[in-house]
Amino acid sequence: MKLHMLNMLNCLLLTVCDGHLHMHGNGATQVFKPRLVLKCPNAAQLIQPGKLQRQLLLP
């Protein structure tokens, strides 16, 4: 469940950064493509799994 939330948040974040990103059933594959991270350098630190997971685990 937490992993699903992590993937969803990353998909939404990258969709905002990259207007050409299309959401598919296997969105997780899209999320971790390096080119998408490079297109959105300001959000790169949010995309790091460790940081985002810590945010999800906080109340």
Curated annotation (Swiss-Prot):
Keyword hit for Translocase: no
The entry's localization annotation reads:
Secreted
Q: Is Signal among the key words of this record?
A: yes
The signal peptide stretch is 1-19
> What tissues harbor this protein?
Salivary glands.
Q: Which domain of life is it from?
A: Eukaryota
From the Swiss-Prot or TrEMBL record, give the protein name.
Anti-inflammatory peptide amregulin
